[in-house]
Amino acid sequence: MDSLGSKGESRIAEWLTDKDYLILEKNWRTRTGEIDIIALDKTEQTSSGGILVFIEVKTLLKTELSDLDLIINKKKQERIIKTAKHFLANNRKYNKMYIRFDVIVLRSNPFLEQPLEILHLKDAFGDCYD
């Protein structure tokens, strides 16, 4: 049976597809970490095409949304940035694209029947070139 987090990630991948994102990878892993979703945001065009987005998905159960640091701390942000660098090293065709790090919070009940709220924090943290 899928975990709550996996179900939440699947729900968010569908939601992103409906919002004109192209999902490139789900649960992309290296020894440095994992990125929940890697997608192209086709809604925002740049000179090099769409925007390459590294997305961390958090599924919360009926809790209040508050400080971003409680949702994704600095250490987790650094791990995602490091993993994104590995993705770019292995997928050079994306190297000239604008890069964004997003956090999407799905607040729901335990069965994910009705999402109470989806909060999409674009450019939530980091910069791949720090």
Curated annotation (Swiss-Prot):
InterPro entries: Restrct_endonuc-II-like (IPR011335), tRNA_endonuc-like_dom_sf (IPR011856), UPF0102_YraN-like (IPR003509)
Entries under SUPFAM superfamilies matching the protein: Restriction endonuclease-like
GO molecular function, one term: nucleic acid binding
A matching Pfam family: UPF0102
Family: Belongs to the UPF0102 family.
Classification via HAMAP family: UPF0102 (MF_00048)
Protein name (record): UPF0102 protein TDE_2303
Protein's organism: Treponema denticola (strain ATCC 35405 / DSM 14222 / CIP 103919 / JCM 8153 / KCTC 15104)
